[in-house]
Amino acid sequence: MSRLNILLIGLGNMGKIHKRVIESNNNTNLVGVVDSSFKKKLELKKGVKYYNNLNSVDFDNELIDGVIVASTTKSHYKIGKKILDLNIPVLIEKPVSINSREINLLLSQAKRKNTVFRAGLIEIYNPIFEYIKELKLK
């Protein structure tokens, strides 16, 4: 099985978690990172492309199997819409958008395009939630 080529948008706290997971998974390959901070480029392994904005990514010539959006919440809708327009599966970190209307528009677009659209709910796997569940059961 070939590895999935992932583009990561945003290299803040959550983006760094996604980056670590992508790089440690034998089934995924981090092909590029989009972040406006040039300092973040220094954190990338050799061979991982750096883009300072989404418009710099050559989607026509890059092999991108999926995109993870971990940028600022206010940018999620615009980025998600562009990625879905390209028929590329996308995971958008929570909160997906600043309002439910934009989320519904993204959901509708994903259905029309028959493309995967998911919310990143990684924190539900945080061990603290298991601990809280145990407390509630006592």
Question: What residue ranges belong to the model's regions?
Answer:
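Beta-loop-alpha module in the N-terminal Rossmann-like domain of NAD(P)-dependent dehydrogenases
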Residues: 18, 49-109
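Short, well-ordered coil/turn segments that N-cap beta-strands
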Residues: 28, 65, 88, 115-116
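N-terminal Rossmann-like dinucleotide-binding module
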Residues: 1-47
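Conserved hydrophobic packing residues within short motifs/helices of P-loop NTPase cores
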Residues: 7-9, 91, 118
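Hydrophobic C-terminal alpha-helix "anchor/cap" residues
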Residues: 22-23, 57, 136
